[in-house]
Amino acid sequence: LSLSLQKIGGSSAIFACKPARLPSPFTIFVFNISNRNDDMTEYRKPTPAEIEALTAAGNSAENWDAIEVAQNFTPAQLSGCRLEGRVQIGRGARLRRCTIRNYRIGEEALIEGVTALECRRESSFGNGVRVAAINENGGRTVRIYDRLTAQTAYILAVYRYRPEAVEAIERMIERYAAERRDTLGTVGPHARITGARFIREVNIGKGATIDGASLLENGTVCAGAYVGIDVQARDFIAAEGARIDGGTLLERCFAGECCTLDKHFTAVDSLFFANSHCENGEAVSIFAGPYTVSHHKSSLLIAGMFSFFNAGSGANQSNHLFKSGAVHQSVHLRGCKFGSGTYIMAPAIEGPFTLVLGRHTQHHDTSAFPFSYLVEQDGRSALMPGANLTSFGAVRDIGKWPERDRRTVKRDRINFEEDNPYLAGGMIDAVNTLNSLAEAHPDAESYVHNHALIRSTQLQRGLKLYNKAIVASLGAMLRNGEPGRAARAAGTMWRGNTFPAGR
């Protein structure tokens, strides 16, 4: 996530104008607004003969005059249904053994065995819901909507020192939520809803599937998303291709494109972005950037920011320091991993691609040292700078992420390149920091930097690893950049200490 934000978060020019005149980068995140109902079907009232046939098939209506059907409607489309309030039934839609109140049913949709599909009041269907991500007390609240991106959410949560920009984006989201408000819910074309119990104030997108959900309330299930057995979700949005299954419990959550939440996972006030996969455990007030992964029952992710992350069994954090309350937060930069049994007491921060092992209670800040190991030694947090540069696990992770990208819309901007200015610059800063420590105390056996212990031998090893990696990274960026591609095409690319013949 950090890599994908450099072009946005790293430039102050994007906020140089007045909030009311935010430039185009924000319009693509927020103002991709389509009409609330783009169904062009012409509807009519059912004829007396059709009403008689419908009644004979076990159907009933609170008021048949409030029911509208497509021009080519046939009574065979309904069986054993109760219709209340205003209901529109699209071409070829099939309704079996269900109760429907105040809904538009798209063409070829299937609704079968549903206790109640109802819109009881005017609703924005999850758009505009406030999610207390990162900080459990709401200091970094993000308002969700069905086209939310990781980039927009990041700016809303992190750029609190730019209040005018945050307020401007929130106003845009508020207008978007107002545009979505309606007294009728929508079931999109070719959607399938089977075996569900209570679905209330939920918009269901084209081709979405709801199979056996227990309770869905005030939300949006976007096109192609799947909601399965025993799921309970309130104030939520499931983006395109998201899969929520296996008794998952959600409250005030956003599940991004192609996210998977499964196997009794529980989440409150959390954001999950592209291709994240969480099972069994729980999450509270987290910002889960793309590819955040947690598979184990005993894992708790709380009050933090993650991306390209993997939590081991029993991984845990604490954001509550008793007298001060649950006001703290942690940041685990791109590519961090927690080993089994890892514990971190917030506030704390780790640099990109850091492997964390053991218990850490001293509120470390290792953000200046990418590709490191942070381990527990004699009750202290010991840092091994650059140690992860020698791990094949990091190489494997970097290679597998683009291969596992299942998205079609690709609303989140993700940079998969491992050789980039963000990481190269981080390693250069790490070398400068290590050299400063060594020069200040050349004979020391160990150093302490931001509550992390660094052994002298590990410092020297880290310098060697970082310097090698910097050279390799800069070479790769030059080779893969536009000048490098042009040089290769012309046969003038420098390789090692030789040039092509004749140069």
Explain the meaning of each model-derived region.
Residues 1-2, 13:
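Short, low-complexity, intrinsically disordered N-terminal modules
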Residues 9-10:
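Residue-identity detector for glycine
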Residues 21-39:
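Short, Lys/Arg-enriched N-terminal segments with co-localized hydrophobic residues
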Residues 41-64, 95, 99-177, 211-214, ...:
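Glycine-rich hexapeptide-repeat left-handed beta-helix
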Residues 187, 191-225, 229, 235:
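Core alpha-helical transmembrane segments of integral membrane proteins
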Residues 443-503:
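C-terminal non-catalytic accessory extensions
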